[in-house]
Amino acid sequence: NRSRGVIDIDTMIKIKNKIYTLKKPTIVVLHHPALEIGGWQDLKILKNRDKFREIIEYSEYVRIVLAGHIHEFTDRTLNGIRYSTAPGLGFAFSSKLSNYEIQHGAEGFNLITINKNKILINKIALK
């Protein structure tokens, strides 16, 4: 499925080597989400997400994983790591609607504020 992302083995090794040497709180940014969203949106997430999560969960320093691609706002925590995706600027989807049905009025972006040990994510709606 061309809509699904895959991290190749060489890149996964590079990520692993980098993650294992972290000494500071870290934000990881991906294109495809590394967590299940639900419904038809799960066809658009990172295919080898379990291996990716296994690597980043090894580090005590990864605080959050940001992603896009699905044009839907999500914000969840799994095993101590926060995962968040952004809505789309031009159009937004919802895992609760039919495949590729546009969710009118959900367009927007995320405003991320980092203060010491806090990461605040505010979804900003376009109206």
Name what the model sees in each region:
Residues I55, T77-K127:
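Binuclear metal-dependent phosphoesterase catalytic core
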Residues R4-R82, I119:
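His/acidic metal-ligating clusters that form di-metal
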Residues N1:
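Oxyanion-hole/transition-state-stabilizing segment in secreted/luminal serine hydrolases
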